[in-house]
Design a protein with these regions (language model features):
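Active-site-proximal region of nucleotide-activated glycan assembly enzymes
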Residues: 129-139, 288-346
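Conserved catalytic-core segment of nucleotide-activated headgroup transferases in glycan assembly
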Residues: 182-191, 316, 327-410, 419
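Acidic donor-binding loop of glycosyltransferase active sites
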Residues: 267-271, 431-444, 456
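Conserved active-site histidine-acidic residue motif and adjacent donor-binding/catalytic loop
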Residues: 251-254, 401-403, 417-430, 444
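A charged, aromatic-enriched C-terminal amphipathic alpha-helix characteristic of glycosyltransferases
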Residues: 349, 491-527
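Catalytic binding pocket for nucleotide-activated donors in carbohydrate/polymer assembly enzymes
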Residues: 439-508
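Short acidic alpha-helix that forms the nucleotide-activated donor recognition element
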Residues: 258-262, 422-434, 453
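N-terminal subdomain of nucleotide-sugar transferases
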Residues: 1-63, 71-77, 106-226
């Protein structure tokens, strides 16, 4: 009993000490925890590290603006770039403190790293909840392209349009997985198939997944794209066989990428179509041919491609920023047709009992492969608010999560949040649920489109990929309206049934053959924009 009392007093005293931290003491503790996380030094473990991090998050949020700015100043000016990035990655990934994105971008841009680490640092920025300003990201991307060119020695003369193979298109993408329920994979395969079958192009596919782990002395918790090893593939898709070569970053060398770009040069395509590849490697063919970037999300791509294919305009301020950053060789094309959200039709059905889900609850799902980083602290509070306001609601998390689960396990709502892990058959799972909720993020458009096909209404904020895929019918203006709408879904059966039918109707209009219309418009506009040389 005395030992337990002593431990509790020690915890209370430690918490009292932390509440009185100065900005310098706060940063010192962050660094100590960061070093402990790396197992570089031994620090007495009076308080579990996760608890300490939660306290550090709270302390930072309660600092004055001037105190917070002083912490930013210290990290910006008192540390070498490598050390600053390690500290910043710990603050972002473990403390879940927002507002340090610009600091990371500055150190990435001004630091001196090898090509592959630079690519992966750019990738970390892309995965942040709040991506740094577009102009900074473009500067980092250009720097990475220059690094690749300098270290590979790639140099080819420009090929005039009249000398290109008019029947050949090369596709570069980030990932091709065996699971064709994986949205980017399905999108690439469907595009390649349609270009070949309906437009008679010879198609070659290349991948360049940014999937290398950053050194632990440089970044905590590397985020990247999953990929298979470097090898040739022949992919049977519908009634066609598609050729692909994978060049994942963790299994490739600079010589491999020189080989990849040389191979594309020798294929001499009409143009290179980048489908959602963030890697600067995908921009290297711009040296000798036209690169067309179809970013697959609503924002403008971070790319040196010649032509940007976009499907929607955002607010005027953002669009003006995009225009300012266009290089002299670049132009944007807006497609009137929406790229259809193709889904593999599944007749498989589940019961809630099979999934260990409660029979008597209104089940709202969160879906994604990066929910640990996409669900911000404020959105976690929103989830708790919904659970507090309506006891008939539970949440279902679909996708692999660790930190998010740990967070909710330490709340009063641990028994009302259920975790299904990665689910290859989303359509079948959705049929057991009631609502799809989208956190503020980039991505998620495909999973929301599948939800509509299952008749699952969607709730999302505007100006994001999910909003683009589900129409204004399912968007709300802010988080307050999001909560009100969710509560109405759970309590008003007439309202719910109306939206359920609207979801089914919208999905039925978004059939697979619409990809032909989309690609027809895209090809017409790309050919009009190709250089007249």
């Amino acid at each position: 009993m005395l030992n337990l009392l002593s431990q509790n007093l020690s915890l209370l005293y430690k918490e009292f000490q932390m509440l009185n931290y100065t900005p310098v003491e706060w940063l010192q503790t962050v660094i100590k925890n960061c070093m402990k996380n790396l197992h570089l030094t031994e620090i007495p473990n009076h308080v579990p590290l996760s608890d300490t991090n939660a306290q550090l998050h709270s302390i930072y949020e309660n600092f004055t603006t001037a105190e917070q700015q002083y912490i930013h100043h210290l990290i910006q000016n008192q540390f070498k770039h490598n050390d600053a990035l390690l500290i910043l990655s710990y603050i972002i990934n473990y403390l879940k403190v927002e507002g340090f994105e610009q600091d990371v971008a500055d150190h990435v841009y001004n630091g001196d790293f090898d090509c592959f680490n630079q690519i992966m640092l750019e990738t970390q920025l892309i995965f942040l909840n709040k991506v740094p300003p577009y102009n900074i990201m473009r500067k980092i991307h250009r720097k990475n392209i220059s690094c690749l060119l300098a270290n590979t020695g790639i140099s080819f003369p420009y090929i005039p349009l009249k000398d290109r193979n008019n029947n050949k298109i090369v596709i570069i993408t980030e990932q091709l997985l065996q699971n064709t329920n994986h949205a980017p994979t399905l999108m690439t395969l469907e595009t390649a198939y349609a270009l070949h079958k309906y437009f008679n192009y010879d198609i070659e596919i290349f991948t360049c997944a940014s999937n290398r782990l950053l050194p632990t002395y440089l970044w905590s918790l590397t985020t990247g794209f999953y990929s298979y090893d470097h090898h040739h593939l022949q992919i049977s898709y519908k009634d066609a066989v598609l050729n692909a070569i994978q060049y994942p970053l963790d299994a490739s060398t600079l010589n491999d990428y020189r080989e990849m770009i040389t191979y594309i040069h020798d294929l001499n395509p009409l143009f290179v179509l980048n489908i959602g590849a963030n890697s600067p490697i995908a921009d290297l063919p711009h040296l000798f041919t036209t690169v067309v970037n179809f970013n697959t999300v609503t924002t403008a791509p971070i790319s040196e491609a010649d032509i940007f294919i976009r499907c929607t305009k955002l607010d005027n301020a953002l669009e003006n920023l995009y225009k300012q950053e266009l290089s002299s060789h670049q132009q944007q094309i807006f497609i009137k047709q929406n790229f259809p959200a193709i889904t593999n039709i599944s007749n498989k059905s589940f019961t809630r009992k099979e999934l260990n889900l409660p029979e008597d609850k209104f089940l709202i799902c969160l879906v994604g492969n990066r929910l640990d980083t996409e669900v911000s602290p404020s959105f976690r509070q929103l989830i708790c608010s919904i659970l507090r306001l309506n006891s008939t609601i539970d949440f279902v998390v679909i996708g692999t999560v660790h930190e998010l689960k740990e967070h909710f396990e330490n709340t009063n709502y641990r028994d009302r949040i259920h975790y299904l892990g990665y689910c290859p058959d989303l359509l079948g799972i959705y049929r057991t649920l009631n609502l799809y909720l989208n956190p503020e993020r980039i991505g998620g458009g495909w999973s929301s489109a599948i939800a509509l096909r299952a008749g699952l209404p969607v709730v999302t904020l505007p100006n994001c990929d999910v909003a683009y895929n589900v129409s204004e019918t399912f968007t709300v203006t802010n988080e307050e309206q999001m909560i009100e709408t969710i509560l109405q879904y759970a309590s008003d059966k007439v309202f719910y049934n109306t939206k359920h039918q609207q979801a089914l109707d919208f999905a039925s209009q978004n059939e697979e053959n619409k990809i032909i219309d989309f690609l027809s418009e895209m090809l017409t506009k790309v050919k009009e924009a190709l250089p007249n040389d």
